[in-house]
């Protein structure tokens, strides 16, 4: 029995790469639709690539939301976010795309997506998008 070559040069994607490539946001039923509550999710290792230089951009994403009938499943959200790591896309476009996908997946009562990009060349950027009415 031979040991598998971990550094095989074939172009066959590894299992983690396949999971990321096939990822989509999965939701499950809100366990308490009658209660108003807020969920916060932090994704501290977001990456994508600058569409002009190809250099990696790093950010911390924060999602704050008040669920409607669905809540986000965290593992699927992690895999979905990871699929942007090799994509050449602007900060503004990627954050708006993520917000659109979050809205389409769960249609929360209210949601706030915050992206805090690491400084590059002495410039940092924060981007906030809101949708819906926050309930009290």
UniProtKB/Swiss-Prot annotation:
Pfam families: QueF (PF14489). GO terms for molecular function: preQ1 synthase activity. GO terms for cellular component: cytoplasm. The keyword Oxidoreductase applies. The keyword Transmembrane does not apply. It catalyses: 7-aminomethyl-7-carbaguanine + 2 NADP(+) = 7-cyano-7-deazaguanine + 2 NADPH + 3 H(+). Its EC number is 1.7.1.13. HAMAP family: QueF_type1. Keywords: Cytoplasm, NADP, Oxidoreductase, Queuosine biosynthesis. The active site is at residues 50, 57. Belongs to the GTP cyclohydrolase I family. QueF type 1 subfamily. One of its GO terms (biological process) is tRNA modification. Catalyzes the NADPH-dependent reduction of 7-cyano-7-deazaguanine (preQ0) to 7-aminomethyl-7-deazaguanine (preQ1). Its main location: cytoplasm. It is found in: Cytoplasm. PANTHER family: NADPH-DEPENDENT 7-CYANO-7-DEAZAGUANINE REDUCTASE. Substrate binds at residues 72-74, 91-92. InterPro entries: GTP-CH-I_C/QueF (IPR043133), NADPH_dep_7-cyano-7-deazaG_red (IPR050084), QueF (IPR029500), QueF_type1 (IPR016856). It is an enzyme of class 1 (oxidoreductase). This is NADPH-dependent 7-cyano-7-deazaguanine reductase. Pathway: tRNA modification; tRNA-queuosine biosynthesis. The gene is queF.
């Amino acid at each position: 029995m031979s040991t598998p070559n971990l550094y095989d040069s074939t172009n066959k994607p590894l299992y983690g790469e396949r999971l990321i490539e096939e990822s989509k946001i999965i939701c499950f039923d809100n366990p308490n639709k009658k209660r108003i509550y807020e969920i916060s999710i932090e994704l501290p290792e977001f990456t994508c690539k600058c569409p002009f230089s190809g250099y990696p951009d790093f950010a911390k994403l924060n999602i704050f939301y008040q669920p409607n009938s669905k809540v986000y499943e965290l593992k699927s959200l992690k895999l979905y976010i990871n699929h942007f790591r090799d994509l050449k896309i602007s900060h503004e476009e990627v954050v708006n795309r993520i917000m659109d996908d979050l809205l389409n997946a769960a249609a929360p009562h209210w949601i706030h997506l915050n992206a805090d990009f690491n400084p590059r060349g002495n410039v940092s950027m924060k981007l906030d998008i809101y949708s819906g009415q926050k309930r009290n």
